[in-house]
A protein has these predicted regions:
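Non-catalytic accessory regions of eukaryotic chromatin regulators
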Residues: 1-155
Length: 155
């Protein structure tokens, strides 16, 4: 898999479906690899270690990245296998969870007085945006459900 091919494909004004699929696959692979790396870091580095804190923030940011091909059918997987990373609201919630943990560790790593450093400030701002987005999404779901119930025929 070559990043330059995907970058060239995405550089056009309207990316093709296959370019979007490739971009989504690379993003999902990056999230999977970062999550595996986090497992290893958590085994050898203590809570609040700067490297662990930074890695958590990067994993959260990767999960928060917009999905380009969320409507494309997933590859066929056994039904009992959990798909990682998730899509939609579950992915957004995963990003929020990683960023909350990152913020806690950044405050230990770089100090409470300066809000966990530059990365800590960026994580805080991103968390505010994501929590707002999650609230909007939840409100949209509630509205859609109410409309769906209202549109049902009454017997």
């Amino acid at each position: 898999m070559s990043l330059s091919i995907s970058a060239e494909a995405l550089a056009g004004s309207t990316p093709t479906a296959s370019a979007k699929e490739e971009h989504q696959k690379m993003l999902d692979d990056a999230i999977r690899i970062a999550a595996r790396a986090l497992q290893g870091l958590a085994e050898v580095l203590p809570f609040g270690h700067p490297i662990r804190a930074i890695h958590l923030s990067e994993l959260g940011m990767l999960c928060a990245t917009d999905e380009t091909a969320s409507n494309i059918p997933a590859m066929s997987l056994p039904t009992n296998e959990k798909v990682f990373p998730p899509t939609g609201a579950a992915r957004l919630q995963l990003a929020i969870n990683y960023l909350i943990q990152a913020r806690k560790e950044l405050l230990v790593a770089f100090g409470v007085g300066n809000e966990g450093g530059d990365v800590g400030k960026r994580v805080r701002e991103t968390l505010i945006q994501l929590e707002t987005e999650m609230g909007i999404w939840k409100e949209g779901v509630k509205t859609a459900r109410k409309e769906q119930v209202a549109d049902r025929p009454k017997w």
